[in-house]
Swiss-Prot record:
GO terms for molecular function: rRNA (guanine-N7-)-methyltransferase activity. Specifically methylates the N7 position of a guanine in 16S rRNA. Coiled coil: none annotated. SUPFAM superfamilies: S-adenosyl-L-methionine-dependent methyltransferases (SSF53335). Belongs to the methyltransferase superfamily. RNA methyltransferase RsmG family. Residues 222-243 are annotated as: Disordered. This is Ribosomal RNA small subunit methyltransferase G. The gene is rsmG.
Amino acid sequence: MDPAAFVQALADHGIVLNDHQQDQFAAYYQYLISENEKMNLTGITAEGDVYLKHFYDSLTLALVLPELQTQVMSVCDVGAGAGFPSIPLKIAFPQLKITIVDSLQKRIGFLERLTARLELTDVQLFHDRAEAFGAKKSPHRASFDLVTARAVAALDVLAELCLPLVKPQGRFVAMKAAATPAELIAAKSAIGLLGGKLAQDAALTLPETGDPRHLLVIDKVKPTPNKYPRKPGIPNKQPLGGA
């Protein structure tokens, strides 16, 4: 997917990027590739692949939750890595208030330099473990309209890291390449325990390749009990779903 095809694919869904936004995506790609030579940010480096599998893929969130396109919303990206999906969302929808938390300082450093280069405002970056960021005494707990994670971790693990950060009546969306029935069954009780309810499993395919994607939308229907998330490392070692 070259940049022109990226712009057209978004326009087909009613998302129109102006020249400045297109320039920001181009600058993002160039800086990502130059910095990737110094640190491991992504294994995807060809321009067409980055535009499709990182940029376009990130923006599928706004196809499933169209309110992201127009409303002022607080969005927390847990484990953003090289900035996906939060930085593409911020470029396309500048009114969003973005918070990024990542456990690796060098990735936060990259994102600090990137946001400065792209002149993005209302982007807060935190070097922290998600378990600590959403702990019971954290000022960030239950403070975001939307929390998202685009990660390979199991859904029950992601739910424990992310749902404590979601406001009442807010949403958590896990962006996954696949969502197996077994994973959803294992996560269902964990999601309920954490105050969530699975509202939608939005199945999509990427243009050109047809690669499958699942956006699992979870509504926050009640407060997360104070004992969650558990201490750093425990959610991964002892998932609530029992996997």
